[in-house]
Amino acid sequence: MVSLLNTGGVSMGLGPSIKMTTLHHYQCPLTNALANDPDFEFTGIIVDGVSEVCDDKIYTAKRVGDIGQMLRADAAVVAIDAWGNHHVDFVNVIEQLGIRGIPSVGLSYIAQQGRLVCTNNFVDCVIDFNKSAAGYESCVVGENNLTDYDAMKAVALVKNKLRKAGKPVEEALDLGESVKLRRLLRKTFAIKEVKFGDTTSIDHGVLTIRKGIEKNLILQEDRIKDVTVSIVEPGNYDFFVNSNLDYSPIACKVRGELGEGVTHLLSGVTVMTTGVEDKSGFQPSNIGSSEGILKNQVVFDRAGTPKSTDYILHVDVLFEEGEGRTAEGIMAAHRVTDWIVQEIRKVLVNLDNMAYTREEFSDVAKPGKRKVVLVKIVSGLGNMYDTAMFPYEPGGFLGSHNMMDSKNIPYVITPNQCRDGVIHSLL
């Protein structure tokens, strides 16, 4: 049973410094670490939404446990980008996996501010990915992000847990050659310059964005008063930005469904969505907004933030008064951004005048190896506190389904689907 600790009350906890953006899930350090480890069969990812009501938290945690058991998991990694009330979901998931004989390694922001509000006997190994010396949540996007180093620690600790459970990876049987189940080919085209022009085009490393690309979109969204699109050159970060709503990649499907086939991706450019309400100037946020001078409000070169060498395609949304506090308003902002990116995708899908780097990813069955699952506990409470699944395009929003609308019932996705952008953060 989960036992509550004396914390003086349970609060929500998801701030700018720990949030996993769409870009973070697209470049997920845990997915990469587990998929690349030769000792594991990475059987899949369970995406579990945080619920509002305690009974629902327990219900979805039990379903995660059932899925883990169905996948014949020997161990699990459980990651969450929130604290406070969200930790009820976190410890319940670890408990339900443990009841079914699946030991877990957890990853969460803890530090001084995010200490667990509840616990149980199965919560015995949690990696604290706090990066702040003060140990407190901040309004700097990416400051307390889960990194490659955290993922490396998780892999090592999972092996230690398996050893204690009598299933050391060294003693796993070799039952034959690995079998590639699904193949994803990613072609990445490097962008060297981004500028405005008469039409949207990509030519020999230059991305041109049509002037006024956002104008017609404003008329489609009643909850949005205005949209401003600008281009931020690498290093030119000494200017004010409104609160961050997301960072996302520019990618498109050329062939196949998300997680297989061929995807085209642009490197050297990242999309940044920000927003503010008209009149009141309210900055959309949960426990802290991230508005301010850009160079002070983001840690670059993290999985969920742009590279310091990237151009940034900045989509700034002016909400009608009150709409930055509604689920519909936040979704409208993400819709507008995706429509803008969609115009770029229409060019990217047929791109043939540039060199590219080629990466091939496979979901792999490894007979006899220890089976490990990754559980991503994501927001599912609505407003700017939700997650959307399976958009039409990699990292997109159009066509997706919100976790809250799905009652936060867990999704099971493949590692390749995660790599191909099936998770979109509405944060």
Predicted regions and their residues:
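An N-terminal assembly and electron-transfer interface module characteristic of large anaerobic redox
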Residues: M1-L427
